[in-house]
UniProtKB/Swiss-Prot annotation:
HAMAP family: UPF0397 (MF_01572). The keyword Transmembrane helix applies. Pfam families: ECF-ribofla_trS. Belongs to the UPF0397 family. The chain crosses the membrane at residues 9-29, 40-60, 71-91, 114-134, 142-162. The keyword Nucleotidyltransferase does not apply. This is UPF0397 protein BCB4264_A2665. It comes from the Bacteria. It comes from Bacillus cereus (strain B4264). Gene3D superfamilies: 1.10.1760.20. GO terms for cellular component: plasma membrane. It is found in: Cell membrane.
Length: 182
């Protein structure tokens, strides 16, 4: 089994703390469903540190949010945050992609967009199914939650997460078009 480096463990801790605390902030769009800008943390940290970090940041961070909020831990939604973080981190495995070094191309951005969107849809459907099957929640309520959560997460991903990740990568680019005059 691969060991987690100290740097990765620290990144997971910081990412989970940020995701957990920022997850308390948002505004309601459906029963128990909020637009939460914290999802952008999963995008950025996943792209920086990979799928394992994204998974753990999502799992730990969402558990922190639910614990602090006091509404109990909703494990289906905790797992869904882990799935989303994992999917955001898949981009880090692409050869030539690095947010840290500012190396990316349009194909990388498309890949992140697709894996992010697919991950969000799979994760939210999982959470809804979990709530119906395991938690005994009413189907009608869950349909509204799943639709609301999917729409809000897609919006946050496309409006905040993706642009922040691209902006961070651009700011880390090693070369410029500036020339030294002699």
């Amino acid at each position: 089994m691969n060991k987690l480096s100290t740097k990765l463990v620290v990144a997971i801790g910081i990412g989970a703390a940020l995701y957990g605390i920022l997850g308390l902030w948002g505004f309601s769009i459906a029963p128990n469903t909020f637009i939460k800008p914290a999802l952008a943390i999963l995008t950025v940290f996943g792209a920086l540190f990979g799928p394992v970090a994204g998974l753990l940041i999502g799992l730990i961070g969402h558990t922190v949010t639910d614990t602090i909020a006091g509404w109990g831990i909703w494990w289906g939604w905790v797992i869904s945050s882990g799935i989303i973080g994992f999917s955001m981190g898949l981009i880090q495995k692409r050869v030539g992609f690095s947010v840290k070094n500012g190396s990316f191309n349009k194909g990388d951005i498309s890949y992140l967009a697709i894996t992010g969107l697919v991950g969000i849809v799979i994760a939210i459907i999982f959470a809804g199914a979990f709530d119906i099957i395991v938690m005994g929640e009413p189907f009608d309520k869950i349909v509204i939650q799943v639709l609301g959560a999917t729409i809000s997460d897609v919006i946050v991903f496309l409006v905040l997460g993706l642009p922040l990740t691209i902006g961070l990568a651009k700011s880390n680019k090693k070369h410029t078009h500036l020339k030294i005059e002699k």
